[in-house]
């Protein structure tokens, strides 16, 4: 799998209160492609960040129905991945990628 394909799978880090609290438990949260599978996410994170991944949990957050100019519309669904890292490993999301 090419690095470009991996960047298509792992879209962005998820910076929320929950994600920050999970960092104490050696977990990191990412927004990922809606069609990405757990094995693909694991390989992409291990390759891009140079860490050992123990497990991946995913969820799909359904898009909200919103109104625009009086007409109902739908926001896009978002897939989130919570990645469990091996003991003693971490990812610095503020530094540049490997």
UniProtKB/Swiss-Prot annotation:
GO biological process: translation
Gene Ontology terms for molecular function: rRNA binding; structural constituent of ribosome
Keywords from the UniProt entry: Ribonucleoprotein, Ribosomal protein, RNA-binding, rRNA-binding
GO annotation, cellular component aspect: ribonucleoprotein complex; ribosome
Family, per entry: Belongs to the universal ribosomal protein uL23 family.
Subunit-level organization: Part of the 50S ribosomal subunit. Contacts protein L29, and trigger factor when it is bound to the ribosome.
Main function: One of the early assembly proteins it binds 23S rRNA. One of the proteins that surrounds the polypeptide exit tunnel on the outside of the ribosome. Forms the main docking site for trigger factor binding to the ribosome.
Descriptive protein name: Large ribosomal subunit protein uL23
Annotated organism of origin: Gluconacetobacter diazotrophicus (strain ATCC 49037 / DSM 5601 / CCUG 37298 / CIP 103539 / LMG 7603 / PAl5)
Gene: rplW
